[in-house]
């Protein structure tokens, strides 16, 4: 990233912290690991003031004592010689700092992080998928009703511009008897593929609720479905992924293997470079945007694909779109339909399975200054 425009006298003057709250458009049910996720969501936000101007962004692992130590530091000193934000400041401040930089430079973030693959001066439009299809059917005793309910949820997304869908599977791993749950997984994926149509891409995510042979059973049953990737079928294991990749190759079934969200194996990237995994999915909030720019360079060099995980953090959804400008083999923005009070994302829009990223300065998200100020006083800190 080019930081030559950062002036040496720009200093951090103030850091404020608040938690904004909101709701999903629809309550989210269970997945293969845990129970109902619900409707409520929150975003921890930092507002940074540098040279009299503010920037907003997601912030984690920040304490008042840590922030106090940053006050008075030069913005330039937060970056290393490569123009990357130093590791010590990333999780706490990378988003508000990048938002501030965009506003000061009068550029969207994607403009000043973009790689050589990006065409300048054209709107940034990025593929996205609806990630809201959880186990909302567990209360229904029969498969037909379950499929109808999940199809209706997919149609809600379709009506809002979504064309690609990720479907939670693994009902038999915890919440239903094994074969009954697996059979329902298959039926629901088939039903939602009808909603998506032949051009819609379908992803399935088991949250590690399958094993190798169960994975093969499901993939064989879905061989005629436009299945794009399989995510977290089981806990990462190179030997099992090698077996699965060879099995898919012998069948001529072109399904990508995706993994990396959560507490992934530290060897996962190494396995991916050896052809065991196709799509890496580390989270956009942790380890974050700058980490992803560095990782994306490495994955691009090996012909691997990037699809940052983002669920439950509304800020990360929109930040992911900007990251696509820095990573050539960026696949999708993971989209969860969330409204956060005081966070205006109306500059973004979804059409035909793509999210249109606004060309406004910073991340293009408008925060309610007065609301944030009140939250800082009432329940946050400065």
Residue ranges of predicted features:
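Short glycine/serine- and small hydrophobic-enriched flexible loop segments
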Residues: 96-103, 297-298, 321-325
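Short glycine/serine/threonine/alanine-rich loop segments
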Residues: 107, 304, 329
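Catalytic core of soluble alpha/beta enzymes
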Residues: 175-317, 350
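Short, well-ordered loop/turn and helix-capping segments at boundaries between secondary-structure elements
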Residues: 282, 325-329, 377
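Active-site pocket-lining/capping segments in soluble small-molecule metabolic enzymes
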Residues: 313-314, 318-352, 362
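N-terminal capping/lid subdomain adjacent to the active-site entrance of alpha/beta enzymes
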Residues: 2-202, 209, 216-224, 345-382
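Glycine-rich beta-alpha junction loops
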Residues: 19-21, 62, 286, 311-315, ...
């Amino acid at each position: 990233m080019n930081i030559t425009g950062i002036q040496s006298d720009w200093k951090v003057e103030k850091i404020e912290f608040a938690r904004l709250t909101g709701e999903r458009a629809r309550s989210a049910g269970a997945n293969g690991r845990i129970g109902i996720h619900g409707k409520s969501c929150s975003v921890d936000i930092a507002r940074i003031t540098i040279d009299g101007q503010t920037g907003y962004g997601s912030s984690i692992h920040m304490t008042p004592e840590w922030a106090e130590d940053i006050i008075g530091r030069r913005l330039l000193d937060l970056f290393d010689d490569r123009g990357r934000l130093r590791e010590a400041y990333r999780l706490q401040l990378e988003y508000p700092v990048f938002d501030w930089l965009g506003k000061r430079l009068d550029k969207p973030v994607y403009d000043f992080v973009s790689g050589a693959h990006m065409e300048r001066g054209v709107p940034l439009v990025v593929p996205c998928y609806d990630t809201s299809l959880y186990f909302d059917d567990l209360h229904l005793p029969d498969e037909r009703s379950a499929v109808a309910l999940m199809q209706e949820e997919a149609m809600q997304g379709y009506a809002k511009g979504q064309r690609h869908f990720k479907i939670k599977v693994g009902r038999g791993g915890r919440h239903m008897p094994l074969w009954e749950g697996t059979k329902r997984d298959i039926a629901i994926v088939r039903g939602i593929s009808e909603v998506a149509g032949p051009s819609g891409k379908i992803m399935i995510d088991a949250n590690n609720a399958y094993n190798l042979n169960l994975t093969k059973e499901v993939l064989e049953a879905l061989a005629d479905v436009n299945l794009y990737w399989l995510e977290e079928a089981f806990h990462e294991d190179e030997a099992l992924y090698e077996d699965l990749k060879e099995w898919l190759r012998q069948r001529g079934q072109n399904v990508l293997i995706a993994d990396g969200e959560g507490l992934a194996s530290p060897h996962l990237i190494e396995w991916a470079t050896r052809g065991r995994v196709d799509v890496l999915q580390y989270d956009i909030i942790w380890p974050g945007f700058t980490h992803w720019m560095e990782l994306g360079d490495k994955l691009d060099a090996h012909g691997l694909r990037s699809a940052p995980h983002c669920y439950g953090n509304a800020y990360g959804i929109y930040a992911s779109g900007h990251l696509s400008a820095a990573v050539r083999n960026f696949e999708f923005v993971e989209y969860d339909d969330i409204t956060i009070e005081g966070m205006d994302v109306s500059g973004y829009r979804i059409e035909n399975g793509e999210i249109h990223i606004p060309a406004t300065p910073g991340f293009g998200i408008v925060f309610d200054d007065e609301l944030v100020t009140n939250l800082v006083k009432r329940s946050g800190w400065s």
